[in-house]
């Protein structure tokens, strides 16, 4: 299985790619958790000046959350609250609180959870 959150650096710019193109970069639970970790790590990296977030491929930035998980990881109120209050909110807060400017490089569909990620960025292009 390919990495679902890719990180590349080009000098003072880090690019974080949501890498689930077969599902239009729909964000699943492991991606939400990994996005939080990656953004927290990049935030404290003093060698950076900017973090760009994008979707893999040309079809979508992110087409929301992975709908298959509604039946498995969000099937009860308790599990849905953990999913959203811990995993989704944790990732969005990590993007929002990044010490470096964040840019959502939007190409293609950007809805649901993808729109939330873009909205948490400082700039959207």
Question: What are the language-model segments listed below?
Answer:
Residues 1-54, 93:
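Conserved CoA-thioester-binding segment of acyl-CoA-metabolizing enzymes
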Residues 16, 53, 66, 117-119:
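Hydrophobic/aromatic residues within transmembrane alpha-helices
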Residues 21-24, 58-59, 64, 109:
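A short, glycine- and basic residue-enriched loop/turn
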Residues 27-28, 65, 74, 106:
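Short, flexible helix/strand-to-coil boundary loops that buttress conserved ligand/catalytic motifs
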Residues 54-55, 106:
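Short beta-strand/turn micro-motifs composed of small residues
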Residues 55-91:
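Glycine- (often His-adjacent) and acidic-residue-rich active-site loop
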């Amino acid at each position: 299985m390919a990495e679902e959150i890719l990180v590349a650096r080009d000098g003072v710019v880090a690019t974080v790619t949501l890498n689930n193109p077969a599902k239009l970069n729909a964000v699943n639970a492991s991606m939400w958790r990994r996005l939080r970790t990656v953004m927290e790590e990049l935030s404290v990296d003093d060698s950076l000046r900017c973090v760009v977030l994008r979707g893999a491929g040309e079809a979508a930035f992110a087409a929301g959350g992975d709908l298959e998980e509604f039946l498995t990881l969000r099937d009860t109120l308790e599990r849905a609250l953990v999913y959203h209050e811990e995993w989704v909110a944790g990732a969005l807060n990590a993007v929002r609180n990044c010490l470096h400017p964040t840019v959502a490089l939007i190409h293609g569909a950007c809805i649901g959870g993808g729109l939330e990620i873009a909205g948490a960025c400082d700039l959207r292009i």
